């Protein structure tokens, strides 16, 4: 994860919390190559930065704090070093944020919608993941995945994405666990209370899939990762459906939920 960059009056928190833009799955195993056709990798200057989710042939959803200039998006990737035959690469044509000022201290607005410079074609390793049709249910088992570090605080980055199952809690659990930062009703709280499984640095922007539905975007959490009673915080996709769908439809006045 990258250390949280906050305003001066929040600098004291930097040693305790971190964005997960460069995290990996802790406590997981290599994902099945067929289970993450929607998972994309965001690169900057040849360096892996974040994950993201393809939601149709032309749009990717990720975390706002993953934004970088001159970003490249790789689709259909499993191994970083051994390309799939159907891998495709794109760059952003447009980027959209809930907060036009890109104020990343507003953690409940950590969402970015990217329009690709050209549509992608479905293939063996590429296919979009649908937006959720119903809200998430506390108690659900959720799937996390990404190329983030698999160890913390020392970082070990894998060549292939790792996956793990975690549990969805009421957001108040994260509000209590991370009292210095606002886990709100616009966020989701997920992890394993005894620790040992978590998203981590490099996993930011990737999906949280609960009961088969795309419900969350990896946002931030404690450091080190996967500590007992410190679940991770995810942007709640369901609450942003109107904004997402209006942007895709071409609206210039779409607004995010308060």
Swiss-Prot record:
Span of domain Peptidase S1: 25-249
GO biological process, one term: proteolysis
Tissues where this protein is expressed: Expressed by the venom gland.
Keywords attached to this entry: Disulfide bond, Fibrinogenolytic toxin, Glycoprotein, Hemostasis impairing toxin, Hydrolase, Protease, Secreted, Serine protease, Signal, Toxin, Zymogen
Keyword Disulfide bond appears in the UniProt entry: yes
Propeptide part(s) removed at maturation, as residue ranges: 19-24
An annotated GO cellular component: extracellular region
Subunit structure: Monomer.
Name this polypeptide is given: Alpha- and beta-fibrinogenase stejnefibrase-1
């Amino acid at each position: 994860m990258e250390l949280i960059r906050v305003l001066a009056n929040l600098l004291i928190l930097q040693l305790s919390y971190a964005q997960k833009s460069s995290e990996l799955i802790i406590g997981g195993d290599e994902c099945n190559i067929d289970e993450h056709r929607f998972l994309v990798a965001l690169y900057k200057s040849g360096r892996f930065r974040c994950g993201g989710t393809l939601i149709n042939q032309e749009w990717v959803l990720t975390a706002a704090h993953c934004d970088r200039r001159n970003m490249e998006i790789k689709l259909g990737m499993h191994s970083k070093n051994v390309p799939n035959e159907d891998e495709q690469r794109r760059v952003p044509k447009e980027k959209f944020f809930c907060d036009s000022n890109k104020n990343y201290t507003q953690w409940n607005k950590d969402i970015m919608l990217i329009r690709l410079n050209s549509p992608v074609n479905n293939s063996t390793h590429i296919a979009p993941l649908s937006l959720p049709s119903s809200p998430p249910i506390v108690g659900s088992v959720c799937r996390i995945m990404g190329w983030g570090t698999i160890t913390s605080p020392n970082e070990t980055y894998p060549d292939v994405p790792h996956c793990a199952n975690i549990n969805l809690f009421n957001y108040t659990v994260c509000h209590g666990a991370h009292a210095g930062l606002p886990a709100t009703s616009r966020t989701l709280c997920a992890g394993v209370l005894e620790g040992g499984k978590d998203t981590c640095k490099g996993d930011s922007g990737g999906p949280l899939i609960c009961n088969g539905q795309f419900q969350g975007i990896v946002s931030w959490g404690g450091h080190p990762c996967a500590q007992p009673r410190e679940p991770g915080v995810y942007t709640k996709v369901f609450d942003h459906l109107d904004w997402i769908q209006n942007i895709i439809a071409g609206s210039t006045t779409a607004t995010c939920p308060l």
